[in-house]
């Protein structure tokens, strides 16, 4: 089975324009989270869309699904997210297992709730690549020079940009593989390894690159929100 896991566990309101976490802010005529879920609803191979939200916001998320996506709510599960990204993925996979016991071939397409401009092509590419690889990371080529500084004051390295990519989401892998690899980490490793695909890489797994889009914007600042609103208006 193919599942989607939407990471919506953040509670930050640092934009300073609302008491709502970013994923619940309005973008056009509906919340960012709803825009994101809608993209996954369009992919018929996805059995369930599991949304991991902070425990304080579970009821709010359920209300939004009832209001904006009543025809699809049977395909959507709202569950409690974790304290960080990877524990949220873990909770999402546990919710999938509660819905239907996991098999070794079950795949989860994980995605940031605040990237509402994901395309169906990106979702389908992730699913296709995940059939033949251990994991998939969605990326775009780096367009700016990346500078490394180990002390925050002086440049220590300027890597070859031709070999560099900017990571986005989705990140896709088999549910059981993630649970096994994450479970094998020490507490210290769990603190350091906050990116799911990095866990696969350091464990020697095959992580394929899926082509992202520069328009696959992650809305984290007021400027990002302004750009997103202009993109919605153009559509």
From Swiss-Prot:
InterPro entries: IspD/TarI (IPR034683), IspD/TarI_cytidylyltransf_bact (IPR050088), ISPD_synthase_CS (IPR018294), Nucleotide-diphossugar_trans (IPR029044), TarI (IPR034709)
GO terms assigned for molecular function: 2-C-methyl-D-erythritol 4-phosphate cytidylyltransferase activity; D-ribitol-5-phosphate cytidylyltransferase activity
Matching Pfam families: IspD
Enzyme's top EC category: transferase
Residues at which CTP binds: 7-10, 82-88, 113
Source organism: Streptococcus pneumoniae (strain ATCC BAA-255 / R6)
HAMAP family for the chain: TarI (MF_02068)
The protein's name: Ribitol-5-phosphate cytidylyltransferase
Site (Transition state stabilizer): 14, 22
Pathway: Cell wall biogenesis; poly(ribitol phosphate) teichoic acid biosynthesis
């Amino acid at each position: 089975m193919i599942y989607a896991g939407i990471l919506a566990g953040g509670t930050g309101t640092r934009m300073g324009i609302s008491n709502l976490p970013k994923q619940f802010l309005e973008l056009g005529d509906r919340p960012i989270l709803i825009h994101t879920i809608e993209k996954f609803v369009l992919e018929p191979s996805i059995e369930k869309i599991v949304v991991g939200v902070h425990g304080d916001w579970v009821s709010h998320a359920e209300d939004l699904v009832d209001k904006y996506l009543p025809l699809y709510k049977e395909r959507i599960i709202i569950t409690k997210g974790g304290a960080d990204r990877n524990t949220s993925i873990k909770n999402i996979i546990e919710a999938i297992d509660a819905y239907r016991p996991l098999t070794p071939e079950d795949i989860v397409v994980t995605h940031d709730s605040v990237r509402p401009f994901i395309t169906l092509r990106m979702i389908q590419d992730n699913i296709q690549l995940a059939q033949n690889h251990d994991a998939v990371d969605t990326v775009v080529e780096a367009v700016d020079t990346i500078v490394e500084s180990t002390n925050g004051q002086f440049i220590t390295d300027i890597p070859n940009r031709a070999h560099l990519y900017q990571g986005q989401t989705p990140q896709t892998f088999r549910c059981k593989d993630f649970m096994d690899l994450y479970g094998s980490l020490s507490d210290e490793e769990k603190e350091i390894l906050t990116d799911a695909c990095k866990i696969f890489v350091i464990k020697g797994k095959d992580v394929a690159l899926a082509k992202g889009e520069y328009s696959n914007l992650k809305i984290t600042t007021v400027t990002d929100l302004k750009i997103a609103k202009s993109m919605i208006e153009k559509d």
